Structure formats: C-alpha cells, structure tokens
C-alpha cells in the first residue's frame, strides 16, 4: 500500500512499462518496481490497460499523485502529433485523457526524458548545477532534456537529429536498442555515441551531460 509521502510513477517505453511507488523525499523506489512488456501492438487502449493493472497491483489509493513518463512530446491540452516508439495510432490522441479515463483518476503525463532530467536536477548528478544541463536517456531511443539554471526547456527531442551519412537520426544510429539489434560491441557503440555527444557539445556547449536510461544497468562497460 502506498503511503502519503509517496507518489506513483510509471515509465512507458518502447520495450517495457515500468511502475512503482516513489519516495518523494529521497527520489527512490519505495517498493520494487513492476515491469510489464510493452504490447507488440502498442495502441492507446493496450498500453493504458497495463498502466491500470500496475495501479491495481500496488493498491494505489485515490489520494496518491500519479505521474506517467511518456515517449513523445507532451503539450498540456493538446493532442499528440508525433510518435516514434509506440503504435502510430497514438497520433491525434489526448494522452492525459486516455490514461485518466483508463485509471479512473487524474494523472500527470510528461515527456519521459523531461521527467528523467527533472529527477537528475532534483536528486541526481545535476543537483545544484548552474548553467545548461543536457540529460540523456539511452534505451529504445535517445531521449533528451535541456535544463537551464534549474528550469526545464520541454520536449527537445534531440535524439532525432540527423547523425549519419545515411541520413539516419541519432536514435536509429546510436541508441541502446540499435547496439543490441546490430550486435555492436561496446567500443564500436561508444564511437557512435561519441559522435552524437560531440555534436551536442558543438551545438549547445552544455555545462554538464548526464547519461541514464536502460543503459545504466551496464554502466561499467
């Protein structure tokens, strides 16, 4: 059962949907997370059904805040106009409305990389950092969040800049999923990532990069 000093967080990705109660004072899981594979046909109805299952699993009370990190640009009150890593039927949908109706309660939906960036500033490697922070997440795609003096610049989607001679965008050239699909060794993948981060350095000259996402589990490599 979730407690009053906690919220319930959901991270929707192209390969998995992860959820857990979160301790708002520590910025950490209050209970072990529950991961359910993203449906092969990841329509709004199919994904929202899984989020409701996760809420029920943790017996989340009506009073608990629910936040959902979603892999697309999110503009409050507007319908989705872009989708890279879930079913294209999401385009034209009010994402917040879909999840609120499925869960039977208000929810807050934000871009997944923006959520990661705000967490880094509040609890992680970027805490207390002045100037420009570029938080990146490496997983099915490449997510980015720009935070300047603690203020989020939302929905940057810099994982879609053109990076290769074949006119591939960055996440189709250097994401963690591409490393797995092309069976790249870590040294070869690191060269691709170096190209990406070098371009970001040239364009934005940030004071700090952070790297997170699914790749965090293999950080020593």
Regions found by a protein language model. Name each.
Residues 1-8, 20-24, 31-34, 41-45, ...:
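Glycine/GP-enriched mid-protein hinge/lid loop-to-helix segment characteristic of carbohydrate kinases
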Residues 10-15:
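Asp-based phosphoryl-transfer active-site loop
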Residues 16, 200, 204-221:
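Glycine-rich phosphate-binding loops at beta-strand->alpha-helix junctions
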Residues 24-26, 73:
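Short coil/turn motifs at secondary-structure junctions
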Residues 16, 28-29, 80, 152:
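Hydrophobic "anchor" residues
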Residues 66-72, 138-140, 207-215:
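Glycine-rich beta-strand-to-loop/alpha-helix junction loops that act as flexible
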